[in-house]
From Swiss-Prot:
Oligomer and partners: Component of complex II composed of four subunits: the flavoprotein (FP) sdha, iron-sulfur protein (IP) sdhb, and a cytochrome b composed of sdhc and sdhd.
One GO cellular component term: mitochondrial membrane
Keyword Electron transport: yes
Function, as annotated: Iron-sulfur protein (IP) subunit of the succinate dehydrogenase complex (mitochondrial respiratory chain complex II), responsible for transferring electrons from succinate to ubiquinone (coenzyme Q). SDH also oxidizes malate to the non-canonical enol form of oxaloacetate, enol-oxaloacetate. Enol-oxaloacetate, which is a potent inhibitor of the succinate dehydrogenase activity, is further isomerized into keto-oxaloacetate.
Organism of this sequence: Xenopus laevis
Residues at which a ubiquinone binds: 203
Protein name: Succinate dehydrogenase [ubiquinone] iron-sulfur subunit, mitochondrial
Record family assignment: Belongs to the succinate dehydrogenase/fumarate reductase iron-sulfur protein family.
């Protein structure tokens, strides 16, 4: 059967992909299979604790993974350990592409997503993996996010209209300029990396809403289609819900989506100042 030759012509000479493919296949043939290559053993020290196991105490357990037979991300290593070494290792994961936020954990000292962080290929270093800090732990790398989700629910993160006569009948129109204001806010995946990196949230998690929830509150405050901006601001007037933010900015540094919760909180504070001025003059 004759080989099919593909050609791509740009501004210069013709590039024949058949030759490139032949070179690629030759390189693959010449390379030694992963099973024959020298093992690249990487150590992972992982936080373990099972509250249902009598007498079990929090500890770090070390596992070894051959990087030649493992995907490039930390989540790949965790899945390999669970599938091939220790099925009792417990962690959350779902999308594997930085969308769902399920695999948020503390990796080598920073809060991030295991599915988007590459394994440190320095074999002399042990990669340390903990659950998100200052949270109750369900088991191993699974934090209890009940309080976090309750706080998110408290801000009513959905569109609210005072005139409900048109609800469900047609779309609420929004200008391109107003829609652009929501960029950098709606992309939040509620992974809790930012909130659990915030010292103010560590100290006052029962009262301070934290950067993730406050950024979502701001997202609805500035939505031109929402009619409850004043009411949303009113709910944040107490000393703790908003004002425990001291612009430490750990939240912005750690966000795996590159968002800026610290800036959103600062904008709420400016809106709050104007809101209080209006309340005094009224």
């Amino acid at each position: 059967m004759a080989a099919v030759v593909f050609s791509l012509r740009r501004s210069g000479p013709v590039l024949r992909l058949s030759g490139a493919l032949q070179v690629s296949r030759g390189a693959q043939t010449a390379a030694a299979p992963a099973s024959q290559a020298a093992a690249r053993i990487k150590k992972f020290a992982i936080y373990r604790w099972d509250p249902d196991k009598p007498g079990d105490k929090p500890r770090m357990q070390t596992y070894e993974v051959d990087l030649n037979t493992c995907g490039p991300m930390v989540l790949d290593a965790l899945i390999k350990i669970k599938n091939e070494v220790d099925p009792t290792l417990t962690f959350r994961r779902s999308c594997r592409e930085g969308i769902c936020g399920s695999c948020a954990m503390n990796i080598n000292g920073g809060n991030t997503l295991a599915c988007t962080v590459r394994i440190d290929t320095n074999l002399s270093k042990v990669s340390k993996i903990y659950p998100l800090p200052h949270m109750y732990v369900v088991k191993d790398l699974v934090p209890d996010l009940s309080n976090f989700y309750a706080q998110y629910k408290s801000i009513e993160p959905y569109l609210k209209k005072k005139d409900k006569s048109q609800q469900g009948k047609e779309q609420y129109l929004q200008s391109i300029e107003d829609r652009d204001k929501l960029d950098g806010l709606y992309e939040c995946i509620l992974c809790a990396c930012c909130s659990t990196s915030c010292p103010s949230y560590w100290w006052n998690a029962d009262k301070y809403l934290g950067p993730a929830v406050l950024m979502q509150a701001y997202r609805w405050m500035i939505d031109s289609r929402d009619d409850f901006t004043e009411e949303r601001l009113s709910k944040l007037q107490d000393p703790f819900s908003l004002y425990r933010c001291h612009t430490i900015m750990n939240c912005t540094r750690t966000c795996p989506k590159g968002l800026n919760p610290g800036k959103a909180i600062a904008e709420i504070k400016k809106m709050m100042a104007m809101y209080k001025e209006r309340a005094v003059s009224a």
